[in-house]
Design a protein with these regions (language model features):
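Bacterial N-terminal signal peptides that target proteins for export
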Residues: 1-11
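Short amphipathic, basic-aromatic surface patches that mediate peripheral association
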Residues: 84-94
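Bacterial signal peptide processing site
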Residues: 23-25
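C-terminal motif of bacterial Sec signal peptides marking the signal peptidase cleavage site
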Residues: 18-21
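Short coil-to-beta strand junction motifs in C2/discoidin
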Residues: 93-101
Length: 192
């Protein structure tokens, strides 16, 4: 009888632990310091991942958006990192040319138009810290933005992303919703 009670209690505790582990609370933002340069990079706790419906080929296209902020001796720069990747075919290369790389983010009927930086910023943390997809090669771009734009994205009800110069006929819709983590990130950077 005592054994049944102990096993029943253990089962209840195990079920509660599993339920707690499966909760969808966003993870906290992280501040990463480069010991060589002194640059601090704040990174969102979870990325926003989007997918484009398959268009009849064997590949499936994805985008990962990661918000970061660089603090280079008091000079703050908010950035949106974009990884484009494809299942089955490896990295999804970006188009070449001066006009490629435009990122359109439709937020509740408003359009945010971001242009890529000419090159990735120096002093970024390692790939794991920046949520670089590890299952396949990915193409990466960086876009300058601001906290208000990040706040707008984090509080949106509808979010659609397009790369008009890359995939003119396709929109990317939410696959894994990192907007709650983005909201935490903006609050973290805005301070008390």
């Amino acid at each position: 009888m005592v054994v049944k009670c102990v096993l029943g209690g253990l089962l209840s505790v195990t079920i509660l632990a599993v339920m707690a582990a499966c909760s969808t609370l966003p993870t906290s933002p992280r501040d990463l310091v480069d010991d060589r340069t002194g640059i601090t990079v704040s990174v969102v706790g979870a990325p926003i991942e989007l997918e484009r419906e398959p268009n009849g080929v064997a590949a499936h296209d994805f985008l990962t958006l990661v918000a970061i902020q660089r603090d280079d001796d008091g000079k703050y720069t908010a950035l949106m990192l974009l990884y484009r990747w494809t299942v089955f075919y490896g990295g999804a290369p970006f188009g070449s040319g001066a006009d490629s790389g435009e990122l359109l983010i439709d937020v509740d009927g408003h359009q945010i138009d971001l242009q890529p930086l000419p090159q990735l910023p120096t002093g970024l943390p390692g790939p794991k810290d920046l949520f670089v997809p590890d299952m396949t090669e990915s193409a990466m771009r960086a876009y300058a933005t601001d906290l208000e734009t990040l706040r707008l994205i984090s509080t949106s009800h509808e979010l659609i992303v397009r790369l008009p110069k890359e995939t003119p006929n396709g929109s990317f819709t939410l696959w894994h919703d990192g907007r709650p983590a983005l909201g935490q990130f903006v609050n973290h950077l805005s301070g008390p």
